[in-house]
Amino acid sequence: MKPGCAAGSPGNEWIFFSTDEITTRYRNTMSNGGLQRSVILSALILLRAVTGFSGDGRAIWSKNPNFTPVNESQLFLYDTFPKNFFWGIGTGALQVEGSWKKDGKGPSIWDHFIHTHLKNVSSTNGSSDSYIFLEKDLSALDFIGVSFYQFSISWPRLFPDGIVTVANAKGLQYYSTLLDALVLRNIEPIVTLYHWDLPLALQEKYGGWKNDTIIDIFNDYATYCFQMFGDRVKYWITIHNPYLVAWHGYGTGMHAPGEKGNLAAVYTVGHNLIKAHSKVWHNYNTHFRPHQKGWLSITLGSHWIEPNRSENTMDIFKCQQSMVSVLGWFANPIHGDGDYPEGMRKKLFSVLPIFSEAEKHEMRGTADFFAFSFGPNNFKPLNTMAKMGQNVSLNLREALNWIKLEYNNPRILIAENGWFTDSRVKTEDTTAIYMMKNFLSQVLQAIRLDEIRVFGYTAWSLLDGFEWQDAYTIRRGLFYVDFNSKQKERKPKSSAHYYKQIIRENGFSLKESTPDVQGQFPCDFSWGVTESVLKPESVASSPQFSDPHLYVWNATGNRLLHRVEGVRLKTRPAQCTDFVNIKKQLEMLARMKVTHYRFALDWASVLPTGNLSAVNRQALRYYRCVVSEGLKLGISAMVTLYYPTHAHLGLPEPLLHADGWLNPSTAEAFQAYAGLCFQELGDLVKLWITINEPNRLSDIYNRSGNDTYGAAHNLLVAHALAWRLYDRQFRPSQRGAVSLSLHADWAEPANPYADSHWRAAERFLQFEIAWFAEPLFKTGDYPAAMREYIASKHRRGLSSSALPRLTEAERRLLKGTVDFCALNHFTTRFVMHEQLAGSRYDSDRDIQFLQDITRLSSPTRLAVIPWGVRKLLRWVRRNYGDMDIYITASGIDDQALEDDRLRKYYLGKYLQEVLKAYLIDKVRIKGYYAFKLAEEKSKPRFGFFTSDFKAKSSIQFYNKVISSRGFPFENSSSRCSQTQENTECTVCLFLVQKKPLIFLGCCFFSTLVLLLSIAIFQRQKRRKFWKAKNLQHIPLKKGKRVVS
């Protein structure tokens, strides 16, 4: 099967839900663009937990305004089912009994239909032969530990011609033995009287269910069963899924008796089925309930449907009509008002029979509980469904809520639920596990959150068997049966183990993660943020201080600058403030309050020719400014030399045209480039990453596995050459550290009950991480497990790939060329084994991925599984020793432009697991770099800032974690002892941040002082002037002389 790929995550996210073609075909055809989309969408809708009134079902399509994308209980609820919850499993007689004409059994309409309509199927004798191997069925029931077993009685096995006269003794003995064995095991029997195997004689004589004579005959048959088995049976089902009996048996012709084209016959059959059920219920209620104390119902099946637009009333109306025409057709007369739904009566008045008032009264309330079937038979074939242009969905929880609102919150038994796998799947039915998990999760949420009264659940089915129109091309059993074997051994599938665990625990226990801890990271912990490639500004943004020429504007009236020749002005030296882009970077970093900033250089910009013949000094000056200006804010840089995000990004064009990383000379060119960067920036940079995610870059060279492995080899050599160069020439003076960062998602077996999946998960880690880690951290050579696995496929003719053979010199070159371990971790992958042929890297691994739709995930399908990062850190320590580890990129995409709650949830949970690794597991974790600073337009939203630099609320959350150094106890101090240098840097930080304001303030203050000084000076001068002038006008007294 060809995998599908969803791009947009830090690594391509492969999405798998199934391993067989039939499942994939149904998934892809359902729901106008894919059932998978509907399943994932429906898992994100929380239903309103309201007490409904009859007929209020359409309210279910209104979305809850209180829904939050990070409330995990709204996606998957870790909780238990109510005490004494009824756990069961079911089968149908025709599907598993076999022996279709043995011991006096009469033929059924399906026995005839198989011979006349189904190609390549001769009979049901190839089924599980439960009629012969009853003890093996009982052992299977014991293995799972169910509370009840739902099975059907074969009407023609008891009465070969359908008429209740003398019962077939062998048939009677078989069912009596089965019931006795169940009672002995404390397993409650739930017995279905009619599961589609009408005696052929009744079809030929009366026309089957089209003739209302069958009603009385069915009642006689039911009466006999009540008499013979009622002392041991407390739960009865009259008819299993009458909709399919009528619609496919008499409408599409897909089921026996194979009639089609007569719509009036379809609704006549449905009418008679309802009346037959009602008659049997009244019979039991009057004559048997008083002393047998049992309950009786009819199993009704349905699909579920979602509106194209939840806000569109017409789409909601169509969804309501779709449900009414299938489930309401039978539920409304029995569980509702005794009549068909009003919409059906108006639309189908010419073909829909009419209930008299007395019949309505008789129909109403003829079920002691609501028995509900929700499985693949209700969803296929799609062209026969009443979709009404809307989207089919597998949301069982919504269907249960609809029943609650339409029929006044009845007690509900899930009488059939499950999915199917391809007939080639044997015991490793991984898809079935996840479908069961999804369905059971929805039932649990319906009980706990929506207060729906579900009291039991029937997994379908116990055994592989005959699957109606699909015959033996699909399997639905929890136990695998080889139909061609003589002994028909029942082998438990993975789904049987899973269901057994669910029953034992009575629900879902949270085993994967431990409780949150309180504690702090060390004071020297690196709190960082990651950015991808920073494109340098080619020219300074502010050239006015560096251009020595004088210009005159509009000298000729053309509104242009004209240079004045012969005049040169004095310029100032170049400054980092010349680059406007850097200022924006610094503003964002200052708001992040991180201690470290990881960014990548653009190799192609620094060395356009790929060698040292043409060095772009302007680009180097730009990068030096980024680092130096960051240091002024107290933010250190972790610089990545090469950060490709696709095949050619960042690789100089001449190297790209020379086959890129397939050419060994590229490694030498990288060494020269690295040496230049160490020389120009190394005095300021203490943490270096040579290559970002070489284990993903090499995947791009995928014409063959040998291309992939060759590119990886050259990438390893390039890193080692750069590390050796730094160690030899620059480390003594610069005292930095160099490593490379690996994409390092964790892997879990998709099927924990399959050894092959456990091996596949470890193989994923070997091919993904150990592929590069083993040569550098440990042996100098590729992992032995990886080499042997590829060689074994080569020997079997499945692949022509081979890992390169390293020389002794190359092993010495590679070994130990890391100063720390740098990991980019985003999610956990669920891995399954699938043997693949072909000589490519993906095929060599024999791995496929499965997405668990019950888990919280991002828009790009990145699953939020926090405990995976802790497992990864422990795995690295266990395999490569106690070394310093930096998580150099970790994050999630979140569609929110402001309140990015998913990102806050992700950060909090993942940092909790990292803290556990530090405090409990003693992993030497040295830093965490959140991915990423700013998002890019038209790409998944991983950024703390939008593409137009608007801050999101996750910044404040990350700030708080950083300032607290984790998750401290109450009243504990988060302060670290600071040196004088740190204090001074704090002052520097304030000055740099407020530099424009301070400058403006100084100018304003100086101007104000100058104006005040002038004003005071002028005032004093005026006072002196007027004083002198006034003295001149003072008169002398007569007779007085002034004697000197």
Curated annotation (Swiss-Prot):
Region (Glycosyl hydrolase-1 1) location: 77-508
One Pfam match: Glyco_hydro_1
Major subcellular location class: membrane
Membrane topology: Single-pass type III membrane protein
Positions of transmembrane segments: 997-1017
Cytoplasmic face of the membrane: 1018-1044
Keyword Nucleotide-binding carried by entry: no
InterPro entries according to UniProt: Glyco_hydro_1 (IPR001360), Glycoside_hydrolase_SF (IPR017853)
Listed GO MF terms: fibroblast growth factor binding; fibroblast growth factor receptor binding; hydrolase activity, hydrolyzing O-glycosyl compounds
Compartments reported by the entry: Cell membrane
Glycosylation sites: 71, 120, 125, 211, 308, 391, 554, 611, 702, 706, 971
UniProt-listed SUPFAM superfamilies: (Trans)glycosidases (SSF51445)
One example of a Gene Ontology biological process annotation: carbohydrate metabolic process
Domain notes: Contains 2 glycosyl hydrolase 1 regions. However, the first region lacks the essential Glu active site residue at position 241, and the second one lacks the essential Glu active site residue at position 889. These domains are therefore predicted to be inactive.
Membership in a protein family: Belongs to the glycosyl hydrolase 1 family. Klotho subfamily.
Protein name per UniProt: Beta-klotho
Organism: Homo sapiens (Human)
Origin organism lineage: Eukaryota, Metazoa, Chordata, Craniata, Vertebrata
Name of the gene encoding the protein in the UniProt record: KLB
